[in-house]
Amino acid sequence: LNIISLSSLSMLVREKDEERALKYIDQLSYTFRYLSQNGANTSFIALREEIKFAEAYSYLYKIRYADKIAFDFDIDEKYLDHKLPPISLQPLIGNAVKHNAISSKRLFRVRIYTDNGYLVVANNKFPMLEPNPGTGLGLTNLNSRYMLLLNREIEIINNEQEFIVRLPLVKQ
C-alpha cells in the first residue's frame, strides 16, 4: 500500500493535478489513520465507519487504475448502525484487485452492498495470464475473526463469473 500509494501520488503531482492530489492525500491519511486506530481492535465497529474507510481506501485504487476500475456502494441505511469487526473490507478489496487482470479492455467492478443482514463484496472475475495464487491468509484470518467474535463463518461464493464474500452484520 505504501509504495503503490506514493507512486500514485507522484503521478498526480507530475500531472499538476493539485485538486486530485490533495484529495488523494486526504484519503490516504484517513486510510492510514483508520488502519492504525483499528488494527488491534478486537471488538466491533459500526458499518457506517467501515464503509467510510472502504470509500477512502477504494479511492486510492481508483486513482491508480483510473477508468479501468469501479467501486459501487449500495448500503441500506437501516444497516448503518449494525456492527462488524473493523478492517473487514480492506482484505476483500485488496484481494479483488490483486487476483484479477485489470486492463482498459473491460471495466473491473467491485460491488459493496447490504443484503438481508449481510454486507456483501462481489467482483467480476478477469483471470490473470499468470495467476497470483496468494496464500489465502486474508480470507482465513477474516473468517477466524468472525468465528472468534460471532461464532459465525463468512460465506464465500466463487463461480466462473464472480467472487462473492458475505459478511454477517450484528444488530446491537
Task: Describe each region flagged by the PLM.
Residues 1-168:
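Two-component histidine phosphotransfer core
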